[in-house]
Amino acid sequence: HCFYNAVMNTNYIEELNESQCAAVTYNDGPSLVIAGAGSGKTRVLTYKIAYLLENGYQPWNILALTFTNKAAREMKERIARQVGMERARYLWMGTFHSVFSRILRAEAKYIGFTSQFTIYDSADSKSLIRSIIKEMGLDEKTYKPGMVQARISSAKNHLVSPTGYAANKEAYEGDMAAKVPAVREIYTRYWERCRQAGAMDFDDLLVYTYILFRDFPEVLARYREQFRYVLVDEYQDTNYAQHSIVLQLTKENQRVCVVGDDAQSIYSFRGADIDNILYFTKVYPNTKVFKLEQNYRSTQTIVCAANSLIEKNERQIRKEVFSEKERGEPIGVFQAYSDVEEGDIVANKIAELRREHSYGYADFAILYRTNAQSRVFEETLRKKNIPYRIYGGLSFYQRKEIKDIIAYLCVLNNNYDEVRFGRIVNEPVRGIGSATLDELNRVVSGMGISYVQAMCESDSLPSLSRKAKVLVPLGETFSELSQHTDDISDGSLIDDILDRFGYREAMQRQGLEGEVRLENINELKSNMITFAKENEGAGLSE
């Protein structure tokens, strides 16, 4: 099937090896591409999409699902180089969560939301769970918010609703064994509170997409018609919910290509289900399997070592990865008796290699599994005067000032957002304590009005009237700025937040630290302007 395509000038024979070429050009049904490490998996996906575009598919009829925004961005850039940006920009390509949130915003009315729904990140979700635990009078030492959040997340990843959870014998026994029988009630309240706040957490983006397609066949039919070919990257990392949605979209026309490697499945603790890739051929009986076994990244020594470990896996799709590179250096294995000794071994090895090969410090990388492990390495490196830089620390979007401004934007977009409102109602400090916030929550819940309306009407509400002097002007400012959420093109909304809510002034009082925080907020503003340029007509909800 490998050929030279004169129309788009792609020479598949020259640019791909035989296995890659076969996987790219097969288009007669479902395909499973088992891609060993360093075997050109991204290359296959990008060429496959280019091949589809060259052979009659329109870009808006192709859906490509990835696990990171970075992977989606890189793929789109590569495809644009092959078929031109004009065609590449219309592809539906992104993470499961970004693509499904786009679908849910378009179809929100079917599932009882507005298109302005808020998306809660993990910290927001945990904060709401903590409030519910407190309201129920439960002991936070027993009902740790992180543990409860993990149980709720696991239920959602298996498409188990609060009602289903309450009726699930396995969940009940698990909760009883862990002495946390109230998890089912927390889950029910959490689900209701998210709906009341017009909010979804990351897991909900999957759950509600599944519900949308399950309960509204006409909507599913529309998206099946639109997505004539579906590609999924890193299939070994999909969970039950993701797999189920892919099945909903592709069961009928069978035009689906999934790429992955069962030997690289490491996310079971986050709900990934290796059975999705192992039993793919049972779910899609007409599947053609392609194996990419040539590793272009590593030496033969490294590849052999990996093969010898993987062959011990009891359940696997057999493959024999090989490399045509030289054998390379043997792999060193050191056993340390403590974390301190481990730090010493690594630091001494760096010093030794620098003496022998005149390497620079930037030629070395230390990889570790958990953030807590960095402490010992840092202490050892400092002791030996070895300069270092830690990557992947606190992310930009986790900084306090960034989360504050995003919370303001979220409340302007969705006046019912309980978690974000709770974060910024007294930020900067304006004398609104937890008692007033609790009362606002009761009013919003009891009267079915928004937080902004509750503040604006607080002078006529007995339980809030004593705080009306602060609440009414605050509510009016929110109300006014909420009218300007359609146009984010110049980022002026962020300036309005800084100036009208006193945030800039509060930062300026913090001296140098405040200046750095304002610079970070400026960076957020630049990101917003760039996003608006790249997504014409986008409003705040996007």
Tell what function each PLM region has.
Residues M176, S374-I386, R399, I406-E542:
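Conserved helicase C-terminal RecA-like lobe
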Residues N27, A88-Y90, K109-D204, F227, ...:
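ATP-hydrolysis module of ASCE/P-loop NTPase motor domains
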Residues V33, A37-L45, A108, P285-K288, ...:
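Helicase P-loop NTPase motor core
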Residues C2-I119, A197, L220-A221, D275, ...:
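P-loop NTPase Walker
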Residues E14-V33, V44, L63-A64, A71-E74, ...:
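Conserved helicase NTPase motor core
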Residues N17, L65, M93, T118-S122, ...:
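Conserved phosphate/pyrophosphate-binding and hydrolysis machinery centered on Walker-type P-loop NTPases
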